[in-house]
Amino acid sequence: MTITEATKANLRRKSGFVDNVQVIDGVPLFSWVDINITELCNRTCVFCPRVDEALYPNQNLNMSIKLTDKIASELAELNYSGAIILSGFGEPTLHPEIYGIVSSLSGPYRLEIVTNGDKLTTTSIENLTNAGINYFVVSMYDGAHQREYFETMFHDAGLGEDAFILRDRWHDGEDDFGLKLTNRAGVIHTGQQPEINVDSPCYYPAYSMMLD
């Protein structure tokens, strides 16, 4: 998979939730809830606030299951059908009660986990899946050799390619970290940008929220 293909796959992962939101009494409801369940991370990336320890220190602070129970209950009251993403600025697999957190948040929506993959094993993938995770997002920072490693791990856990995405994040700043910007609503024309339907409503300003 080339960088462009990997990036497009990642954009497709979110586009359905950005473009198809619930509208309640004429007001769009958020469709993408990013939850920062832990302040722990085992890496320091140059494009993350954690690169400056004075600004964002590594702390052993973890969201409680009592709080995630409350979040899940309030989302149920809204008949929420978007996505919940366990990510934020921490490494979610470092949460000491990660399986309980996942089980607490499991519901009639997509439940993703975004991870650097350092703590993943075939067994932990199986346990996370059984607890309620239905999509894995792995950011690979060490090199292209990680692709085969993680593909084998997920396949050994019984998951197909529709249950995970491997994002190439091992690029440096000169290569924009392997990321590709969107066309910013049609005002940027660098590279080949797909045409968009300008007559459709835009929910981008309201689709996402973060809970910390």
What residues fall within each predicted segment?
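Radical SAM enzyme [4Fe-4S]-AdoMet core and its adjacent flexible, acidic
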Residues: 2-9, 24, 36, 57-58, ...
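Conserved alpha-helical substructure of the radical SAM core
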Residues: 2-135
